[in-house]
């Protein structure tokens, strides 16, 4: 068994809103041109940040996937059609969207914020028949610590 290392130059780049939100995608979509493709249940993997301004990724739909977002820096705001309200997530917080039969959501990245997002395919043929759900966990409820190297 060999291990392949995919450096930043091998990863796909992405952006929203004319570059207000930037992305580096170790595993992106086929049209993104990255060298690493979806593997097993891991479908998408991206690091996104808003370097200069607050910026919104508009309301858009998902079906089937389970989407985990980790707030690495700053704050983001999340809206979805299940909650029907905006909520704020801060550094260290985690949200999980189980898209199931379908859910639409929007994210607002605040200036200087960063997120890490992973999409899983739990078994798309079954998950398309499950009701969607949303959950968020505050960093204060997670058992973790930061190590400075």
Q: Which residues fall in each region the model found?
A:
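A short beta-loop-beta micro-motif enriched in histidine and acidic residues
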Residues: 36-39, 51-67, 82-85
């Amino acid at each position: 068994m060999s291990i392949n290392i995919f450096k930043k130059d091998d990863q796909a780049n992405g952006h929203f809103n004319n570059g207000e939100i930037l992305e580096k995608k170790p595993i992106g979509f086929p049209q993104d041109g990255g060298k690493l493709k979806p593997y097993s249940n891991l479908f998408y993997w991206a690091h996104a940040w808003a370097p200069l301004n607050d910026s919104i990724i508009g309301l858009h739909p998902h079906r089937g996937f389970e989407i985990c977002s980790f707030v690495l820096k700053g704050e983001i705001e999340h809206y979805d059609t299940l909650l029907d309200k905006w909520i704020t997530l801060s550094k260290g917080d985690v949200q999980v969207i189980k898209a199931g039969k379908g859910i639409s959501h929007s994210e607002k990245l605040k200036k200087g914020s960063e997120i890490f997002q992973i999409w899983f395919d739990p078994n798309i043929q079954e998950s398309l028949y499950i009701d969607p759900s949303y959950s968020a966990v505050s960093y204060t409820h997670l058992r973790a610590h930061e190590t400075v190297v």
